[in-house]
């Protein structure tokens, strides 16, 4: 059964507020740290991919997808 609309609105609003507080630079550094943990040949590839594509992916995910995806999965909210 779907969750009432006010809860879905509250969920999306809350996630957007959290996104506003957590700078994207912090997330980029966290991804870069993961690349340092993996073995060297893969780590170099990981670092290269992170530098080129993580900004694009984070912008897309955080700005558009994340609130609707999380609230849809957790609360079964429609888009």
UniProtKB/Swiss-Prot annotation:
A Gene Ontology biological process term: respiratory gaseous exchange by respiratory system
Assembly notes: Homodimer; disulfide-linked.
UniProt-listed SMART domains: SapB
PROSITE patterns, per the entry: SAP_B
Annotated compartments: Secreted, Extracellular space, Surface film
Functional note: Pulmonary surfactant-associated proteins promote alveolar stability by lowering the surface tension at the air-liquid interface in the peripheral air spaces. SP-B increases the collapse pressure of palmitic acid to nearly 70 millinewtons per meter.
Other information: Pulmonary surfactant consists of 90% lipid and 10% protein. There are 4 surfactant-associated proteins: 2 collagenous, carbohydrate-binding glycoproteins (SP-A and SP-D) and 2 small hydrophobic proteins (SP-B and SP-C).
Protein's UniProt keywords contain Signal: no
Any one of the GO CC terms: extracellular region
Main location: secreted
Name this protein carries in UniProt: Pulmonary surfactant-associated protein B
Keywords in alphabetical order: Disulfide bond, Gaseous exchange, Secreted, Surface film
Domain of life: Eukaryota
Residues in Saposin B-type domain copies: 4-79
Entry keyword Disulfide bond: yes
Cysteine-cysteine disulfides: 8-77, 11-71, 35-46
Organism for this UniProt entry: Sus scrofa (Pig)
Phylogenetic lineage: Eukaryota, Metazoa, Chordata, Craniata, Vertebrata
